[in-house]
């Protein structure tokens, strides 16, 4: 008899098959003496579409809303039906007596496998493989410690509840908005609050009125002292007359050192990366989108097998990982990391390390290197950058704390308080892992008293006429969101909550904010693809479509409190603390209330981006929209779906102003255009680049267009596709 193993993806299945000795190729499977390994392609089974329950739902009609099937059912996804058949063929084999679920260890991974098994009416006993990396060692250890799949029944119930709740609320609300306002409008419990946060930030920027402030400094003996309010501790003076008086007084008297305080301090390295923190860093340092970072991490995890599971929300390790740290250090002991790894090995590797805490790891531990030796030459430049971030953070936490001496000088000029600060490094410790010293998670730019190198000074010293400076500044508006800062806001949206009740704040903290670490990148990407967001440089802006949508969506759907409440209840279901049927009854009642509110709402939606160009398919006027990397014309009719690309942003630099150029046209007619007015046909561009030693071939251009083709092929006007985008959270 044999055991059937179901993996989530072909690449993971191949790794498991190799470890288990399954080399014989079957239809959609790999077979060995004891095991058969097959795979899904992500989800092979999904919830049925509305029209699958009743033909009347095929037409988008407000009169039939809300759609509330008595029991939501599942169906095979047509595009992946062939692989579903391959899996069920193996399931039905008489020589298969046991199933091992080896999909991703988490709520959605559980759903991938369980829906396949449910649809196939499987009755065979199941075990669960729960691992955080796909190295040979992790797979072997995982199979040596298989769990009974029944231990994860509550996790499955939570996953189904999430999917069904999003179906009921998302599809019904999307159809209601689309029907009422005759425009492709979608909403969801995560994407809509995310838009609302961006809208609030834009409102804060619009309403911001800069206010002048003044600072007074005294330069003496090579040190700059800053005036400080003894009561508030602030260094900014709002009253210009007061600032002028302080400056004039300081010019007439000597500076006296009142106190010189020196303290030796130490600081541990920043915690290990979870996915969100890694996406933030990659956005800030390299300008990578959240989705790009996730894709690179996925490649380093699945293809190269040099980093652990990427979709984690923990920055800690469990005690059982500690014995593997030495092997992981051996694996990274190459090139630029060799000396640091050797130094880290001399530190005590035990469970007392500050980043080891079982209680702070739920499904997966922090992202760290695997025991697999890496070949840096096999990584792309982008992959190597992400790998470098993870390895340096891993090495940093294993190195000693950084030790420094902090000096704070308090001085006075005729009863006015002045202060200066300095820091002298004693032992670099973990900072040696960072060549560029960009290691600190805190924004040191906010320090009002800058740190400086201080000479040897003692209390009581009197310094004659210091050089006094009075400077005027203006307060700055809040910064616009980038993908990195938007991820931070989604992870911790408390600032954007109307209700700051302590229980709600605690709930959203425990639930992990808006969305999950595994879905936030996709949510942001979908907001761009739905033309609700656009980018200018690295900054994110709302489109007119998004601003109008937020006026039409029920207020409840715009609040982070809603998704926090859902996630907390889903976690309770996963832990067996709440019954699934109770949660779903509440969701059905909420859906009815939501649709009633949309039906009775007064409002209008106006396309303010209509062009005079008509759709070649249906004759309606096209809409001009800005995609993430392109400008497009799309049909306003949601059933038509026509779109065409007008221009694309490229990495090609203008020879005049050195800014990025756009590409318009196709093939030999393609032309590069710059905002400064420079234009260049493709042939001329290729000739120029060849002379400069950076020739661009047709293959280069084709590869670039292929890379960006995905956005151009996204079905933005298929109404049900839009609905699905709004609810896959």
Could you tell me what each predicted segment is?
Residues 1-163, 230-231, 477:
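Intrinsically disordered, low-complexity regulatory segments
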Residues 1-2, 102-105, 182-186, 262-271, ...:
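Conserved short loop/turn motifs at secondary-structure junctions
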Residues 2-4, 80, 91, 174, ...:
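Basic, low-complexity terminal or inter-domain segments flanking catalytic cores
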Residues 27-55, 192-238, 397-450, 589:
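Structured, non-catalytic alpha/beta "coupling" segments that mediate domain-domain communication
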Residues 114, 138-220, 262-263:
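C-terminal or mid-to-C-terminal helical accessory/interaction module adjacent to the motor/catalytic core
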Residues 237-271:
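Metal- or metallocofactor-binding catalytic centers and their adjacent structured scaffolds
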Residues 304-305, 531:
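Glycine-centered, phosphate/nucleic-acid-interacting loop/turn motifs that mediate DNA/RNA or nucleotide
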């Amino acid at each position: 008899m044999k055991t059937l193993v179901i993996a989530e993806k072909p690449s993971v299945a191949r790794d498991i098959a190799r470890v288990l000795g399954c080399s014989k190729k079957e239809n959609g499977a790999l077979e060995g003496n004891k095991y058969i390994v097959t795979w899904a392609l992500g989800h092979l089974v999904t919830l049925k579409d509305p029209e699958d329950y009743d033909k009347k739902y095929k037409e988008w009609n407000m009169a039939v809303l809300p759609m509330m099937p008595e029991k939501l059912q599942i169906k095979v996804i047509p595009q992946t039906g062939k692989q579903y058949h391959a899996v069920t063929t193996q399931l039905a084999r008489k020589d298969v007596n046991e199933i091992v679920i080896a999909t991703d260890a988490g709520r959605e991974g559980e759903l991938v496998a369980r829906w396949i098994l449910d649809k196939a009416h499987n009755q065979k006993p199941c075990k669960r493989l729960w691992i955080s990396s796909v190295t040979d060692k992790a797979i072997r250890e995982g199979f040596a410690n298989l769990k009974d799949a029944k231990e994860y029944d509550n996790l499955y119930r939570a996953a189904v509840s999430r999917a069904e709740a999003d179906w009921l609320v998302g599809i019904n609300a999307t159809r209601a908005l689309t029907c009422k306002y005759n425009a492709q409008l979608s909403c969801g419990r995560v994407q809509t609050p995310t838009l609302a946060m961006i809208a609030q930030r834009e409102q804060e920027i619009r309403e911001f009125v800069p206010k002048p402030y003044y600072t007074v400094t005294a330069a003496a003996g090579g040190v700059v002292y800053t005036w400080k309010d003894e009561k508030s501790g602030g260094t900014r003076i709002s009253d210009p007359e007061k600032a002028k008086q302080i400056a004039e007084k300081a010019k007439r008297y000597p500076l006296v050192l009142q106190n010189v305080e020196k303290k030796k301090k130490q600081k541990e390295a920043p915690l290990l990366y979870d996915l969100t923190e890694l996406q933030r860093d990659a956005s800030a340092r390299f300008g990578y989108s959240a989705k790009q970072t996730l894709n690179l991490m996925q490649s380093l995890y699945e293809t190269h097998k040099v980093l652990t599971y990427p979709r984690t929300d923990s920055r800690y390790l469990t005690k059982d990982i500690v014995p593997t740290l030495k092997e992981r250090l051996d694996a990274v002991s190459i090139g630029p990391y060799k000396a640091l790894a050797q130094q880290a090995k001399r530190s005590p590797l035990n469970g007392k390390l500050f980043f080891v805490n079982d209680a702070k790891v739920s499904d997966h531990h922090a992202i760290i290197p695997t025991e697999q030796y890496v070949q840096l030459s096999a990584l792309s430049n982008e992959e190597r950058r992400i790998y470098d971030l993870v390895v340096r953070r891993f090495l940093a936490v294993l190195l000693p704390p950084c030790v420094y001496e902090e000096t704070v000088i308090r001085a006075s000029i005729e009863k006015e308080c002045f202060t200066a600060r300095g820091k002298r490094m004693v032992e670099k410790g973990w900072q040696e892992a960072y060549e560029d010293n960009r290691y600190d998670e805190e924004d040191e730019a906010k320090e009002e008293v800058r740190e400086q190198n201080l000479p040897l000074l003692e209390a009581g010293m009197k310094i004659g006429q210091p050089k006094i400076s009075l400077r005027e500044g203006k307060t700055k508006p809040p910064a616009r969101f980038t993908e990195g800062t938007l991820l931070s806001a989604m992870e911790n949206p408390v600032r954007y909550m109307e209700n700051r009740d302590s229980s709600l704040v605690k709930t959203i903290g425990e639930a992990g904010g808006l969305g999950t670490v595994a879905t936030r990148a996709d949510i942001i990407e979908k907001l761009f693809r739905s033309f609700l967001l656009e980018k200018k440089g690295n900054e994110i802006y709302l489109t007119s479509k998004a601003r109008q949508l937020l006026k039409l969506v029920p207020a409840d759907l715009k609040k982070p409190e809603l998704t926090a409440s859902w996630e907390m209840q889903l976690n309770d279901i996963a832990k067996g603390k709440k019954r699934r049927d109770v949660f779903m009854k509440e969701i059905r009642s909420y859906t009815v209330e939501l649709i009633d509110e949309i039906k009775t709402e007064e409002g209008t939606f106006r396309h303010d981006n209509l062009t005079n160009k008509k759709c070649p398919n249906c004759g309606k006027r096209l809409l001009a929209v800005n995609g993430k990397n392109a400008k497009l014309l799309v049909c306003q009719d949601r059933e038509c779906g026509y779109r065409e690309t007008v221009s694309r942003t490229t990495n090609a630099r203008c020879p005049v102003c050195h800014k990025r150029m756009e590409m318009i046209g196709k093939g030999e007619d393609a032309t590069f255009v710059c905002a400064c007015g420079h234009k260049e046909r493709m042939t001329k561009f290729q000739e120029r680049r060849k002379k400069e030693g950076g020739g661009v071939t047709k293959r280069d251009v084709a590869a670039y267009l292929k890379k960006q083709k995905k956005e151009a092929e996204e079905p933005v006007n298929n109404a049900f596709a839009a609905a699905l985008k709004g609810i896959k959270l």
